[in-house]
Amino acid sequence: MIKLSVLKNQQIDLYLNSTIGDWVANHIKWNLGMVYRHGNRSESAYQDKFHNFGKYAAISVHWPSIFSQSKIDEYRFFLNVHSGLLPESRGMYPVFWNVFEHTPAGATVHQITSKLDYGPILFREEVAYSEFESCRSVWSKVFELEKRLFIATANLLSNFPDSLPMKKPVGNIGLNRKATEFHHLKSNYDRLNLSKKEYVRLKLALDF
């Protein structure tokens, strides 16, 4: 986790995995000049060196664990940058499922709640991709969008608003995809009864 030391005796905590951790640290260092880092970015246990600060907000990006309600309740705002359009693309590996099922791809910033990937939405934006584009290609577009939305979120929080312009999720609530579903398809696609079109789409989705 990375801590941002900020004004008004507040703090913004960042829960990041290694995919985005270095980029975020470097970006904030060069653009905001206030990053403080401790612990290994790929580990979940950190020593809190800023325990005297108030708990204002946190941003999560690709964090591998589900946050407990007690952890969520520590912050006024606890926002997650999700690599899918919510509430449709919930759960693990949304870009994979977007490519396999040829559904809209994008990224969402939302408040973390007890219902996974279904909190009020701050930002939600789609990326365009073609029918025969690989998961690798679509993911690169989504990742660039996530970076942009992360910066927009951090900038918004840096002003310490008492409220954020969040909207209730609308549309179909998607399945909460599990990692086991992905690994089952990846390991058994040659033994599944897939149509030719499904097989082609799965090969594209597995190209990452």
Language-model regions, residue ranges each:
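One-carbon transfer enzymes
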Residues: M1-F208
